[in-house]
């Protein structure tokens, strides 16, 4: 696996990243255990950059990803997320304010 440093941060991320949208059932139904295994496999094979969003499966992707990451050493991965689009039950809410973005980060940590 090839890695590149992000600026001068010292963070070296893999050229390939794990896109966690499928963990939320965005494309098809997924068994939670299979999703967790996919995360383990990605990290075991050198992927250390994981992209997720609270909107993927209306928080489901974050929930499944969180279950997988609890079992992995914290220094094995970096997380990327998105802000601005929220919603449950098919309703969309758009809010790009700084206040809502900060709230979203803390919601994701729960």
Segments and roles (model prediction):
Residues 1-77:
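N-terminal binding-site loop/beta-alpha segment at the start of enzyme catalytic domains
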Residues 22-27, 86-92:
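A short acidic, helix-capping loop that chelates divalent metal ions and anchors anionic groups
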Residues 75-88:
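A short, structured active-site edge motif that brings together acidic residues
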Residues 92-110:
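Glycine/proline-rich, positively charged
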């Amino acid at each position: 696996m090839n890695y590149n440093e992000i600026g001068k941060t010292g963070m070296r991320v893999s050229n390939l990243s794990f896109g966690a949208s499928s963990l939320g059932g965005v494309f098809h139904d997924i068994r939670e255990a299979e999703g967790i295994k996919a995360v383990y496999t990605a990290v075991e094979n050198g992927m250390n950059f994981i992209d997720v969003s609270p909107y993927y499966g209306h928080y489901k992707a974050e929930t499944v990803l969180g279950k997988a990451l609890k079992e992995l050493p914290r220094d094995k991965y970096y997380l990327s997320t998105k802000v601005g689009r929220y919603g449950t039950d098919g309703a969309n809410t758009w809010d790009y304010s700084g206040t809502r973005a900060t709230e979203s980060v803390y919601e994701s940590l729960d």
